[in-house]
């Protein structure tokens, strides 16, 4: 079975180490918040703002936009130098996806780029997705998997990141069920987005399996944002893949009670998981 990249299908043997959750070009200004603390005056976006952004991650809209293909290609060069060969770009509609520019980024960087299909959390869904029934959404996903996305000819390598909030909304449940049905029919993996606000991963996995997905074809994402050993153990024992995929996001979501773990804490999670 070939692996679909933005430059066409490749054999699995041609793909080495792969970063499974990346965003190369995206626009998440939908999440921007009015700052409670103004940024330092006259300081441009860059490392000098790191301390401010750690506490005010969503307060500068420019901070949540990845807009430059040249920068994306340059940063992907680090994948090669680290011994990797591919990345999975999980930016979807409503997140600023720019599919047409990904092939050139892949060529310039020498990195295989694979994309996902599906629908993110409800606030990013267009009306025709938010109100559609499961059958309609399933048909849309099957078309993308088999023919390519939105006339680009680019076929997704998997379904994801399928967005769920906490609690999961009705529209998100329909989206999730559609992804499961499309994945079960085609063999595509489903990669989910879990909210940092709560533990919905076990219920999400149950619904995916109920709709026909094999657990070992399901990736439960962002588990390193919500550290609970029993929660992670339950998902692992059910047969799904655990994604600790938010390394580098050491910041607060607007309050001291909404802090992402540090990378050191994430490494402790990995150490614990390996010991289980």
Q: Model-predicted segments: where are they?
A:
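Histidine-centered catalytic micro-motifs
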Residues: 17-26, 87, 194-195, 242
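Active-site gating loops and adjacent loop-to-helix segments of metal-dependent hydrolytic enzymes
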Residues: 23-67, 117-135, 246, 255
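Divalent metal-binding segments
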Residues: 46-73, 90-94, 161-169
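Catalytic domains of carbohydrate-active enzymes, especially glycoside hydrolases
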Residues: 74-88
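Active-site gating/metal-coordination segments in enzymes
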Residues: 85-86, 104-108, 112-189, 241, ...
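Distinct, well-ordered alpha-helical segments
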Residues: 100-103, 128, 169-174, 197-211, ...
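Catalytic beta/alpha-barrel core
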Residues: 189-196, 217-225
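Active-site-adjacent C-terminal substructures of enzyme catalytic domains
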Residues: 226-276
